UniProtKB/Swiss-Prot annotation:
Protein name: Acylamino-acid-releasing enzyme 2
Family: Belongs to the peptidase S9C family.
Subcellular localization, as worded in the UniProt entry: Cytoplasm
Entry-linked SUPFAM superfamilies: alpha/beta-Hydrolases, DPP6 N-terminal domain-like
Signal peptide as annotated in the record: none
Major localisation: cytoplasm
Keyword line: Cytoplasm, Hydrolase
GO biological process annotation, one example: proteolysis
Subunit annotation: Homotetramer.
A Pfam family hit: Peptidase_S9
Amino acid sequence: MDALASEEYASQSKLLQEFTNAPSIDGAWVFQTNNEDRSTAMYSISQTNLLANNKRKYILFSHIMRNGTNLLDFQWSPFPIQMDGVSAVVPSPSGSKLLVVRNGEKGSPTKLEIVDQSHVEKEIHVAQSVHGPLYTDEWFHGISWNQEETLIAYIAEDSPEPKPVFDDTGYRKEGSSEKDCNNWKGQGDWEEDWGETYSKKGRPSLFVLDINSGEVRAAKGISRSLSVGQVVWAPPSSCGRQKYLIFVGWLEHNGFQNTPRKLGIKYCSNRPCSLYSTLCPFEESDVDNAPASDSKLEPASVAINLTPSISSAFFPRFSKDGKLLVFLSANRAVDSGAHNATDSLHKINWPSDWKMDQYLEITDVIPIVMCPQDGCFPGLYCSSMLSNPWLSDRCTMILTSAWRSTEVILSIDVLSGKATRISPENSEYSWSALAVDGHNVLAVSSSPIDPPQIKYGHQVSLKDQTCTWVWDEVNNNPLMAANNKVKALLSHHQFSILKIPVTNPSDDLSDGSKLPFEAIFVSCKDSSHKPTILVLHGGPHSVSVSSYSKTSAFLASLGFNLLIVNYRGTPGFGEEALQSLPGKVGSQDVQDCLTALDYVIEGGLIDASKVAVIGISHGGFLTTHLIGQAPDRFMVAAARNPVCNLSLMIGTTDIPDWCYAVACGSEGRQHASESPSPDHLRLFYQKSPIAHISKVKAPLLMLLGGADLRVPISNGLQYARALRERGGEIRIMMFPDDIHEINIPQSDFESFLNIGVWFKKHLSISASDASA
């Protein structure tokens, strides 16, 4: 590395650390007090620790005080509390106790701590022979206290099947202990996992902890062909106890033609799933010891499928009065094959004394929106749900959902089915609900150039007897103080959301797919003279919302404009627009990106001669397509774990069905096979960036995660080597332990540091440009 390059690395790394060091809000809980005008909020905070290559986790508290004139005051704890080695924290319903989870490593037990308001009340060590680490991801994760706060249900890795044991005489029938060194364990049968992110993780299984005794029991009656998650307790029965557990189950026979295979589940809501019910394992002793003639007791049998009539059901939530079970469904994704699509919301009227063999009718609350009118509700697109989403009226739930290129907060009246946007309608910022506080909402808002700010929303009555939501800024927020340097670095930037008309729409397109798509434009002062980065999301059925991103903000601070395109196929714009892309990848999405670029060029917003492009996954697919199909329009490119050759990916990825869906469209499901036909392999190749590699001119930086199961490194390496063979300028960075996201802290840091240096080198940004 020459002196000039070394100086650039030093300068940019110092700048990037300013963005990396800022804390993030991961979640929050609100607890009521005896005073109805006061409550307490607990925040889960994380901060990147580059030296340790992990994230620090903190807990921070604030007291929320209101009065009759709607004045609001937040009193913050003086310092956050660091939670070393903690995998998850979950408060009890009353807020008087806290479960602290410390997942074991390398065969050590999992530690479950019950903390009250003054000390650790109990510490339970769960041996690996009972279960492995608890799931804390966004999909299988589920930890649920019962109302009496005596039992905790949770999802953990099941213990692996016993391995065959051998010694110098051959096979040992009786097995062996871990301490016996005179033998060795074989491998046994291969046990498939859920692909990307879940490599080497055990089967997600349901367990219940009795806090008083410290005993842990596995739920019974659940087939080993079912992976479970998102557990909640059903309301108390007539006996006054909560006897039943409700959970989500994913059948493992979801391969082609219903064959046994766990197709990858990360980022894929199209995996069939149902709500199930089973008896709490600590109720079984009552059943087993009862007289055979006692017909009032239910047998401890198999788990019951509560939603057999719908192909997808997840995020179960009971209303506060226990009369409704509400859940989301991705049945449109399951039925169409798109890996994400428009969600729907449903409810079940829950009987006060339900029996496991009792039929439950499903009613629609929010249906799928096909083609939204301009400015109207586009449908539900929810990647998560609050553990307690209910306002104090007991019939209104709070959801966070994508709404075109923004994220908004919605209130849903589950009785009438009315969806209302309660975050400001005239705001291009993105909003996300953190917690419900009675009839109020604690939230966070941000933009591409504004770090997250905590907001507090409450309803105000108007003269016409209607209500509106008012959002107050939270005073003395210590998290904002940590972001002051970042705000100063972005103070000369602005952003807007552009509506991009579809050019020359064909007659065979649906109405929804002819409507404008959008791009988020982050610009410097005098943007027309600054270089621009075209930023492309993956999926293709994911969305770039107008929220704060540390890495995007870093690139903007270097003096780049950012054009972040939500091409057709992006969630948040109605189902017709989303479904217009499958079967047309490499053409429709490529054209949308070029149309967005033309829009800002023709508007005089950017310099057409200074354009770079970057994307991850399907965004990398588009990046490598664009530099091949439009080689004279891009000076430089960077691709992170890109899809470059579908015909190679089909045999190596954890989601081969994705290859059929994006290339073949609606016909993909019927043709999908583990042994693609020559015609399909030819089609996959024709729709891939590698088909255009001979035309590439732009220098390309390729960043690969060595442990990526979604787009294995063979895909990127084949393209990179083929480009090098043709004399192209290519630089490869490999992160051996990283998965598809490349999100290990040091890898993430080094990735974007090199992207910044690479782009500045090939776009010739001066120091004065970056500071302007």
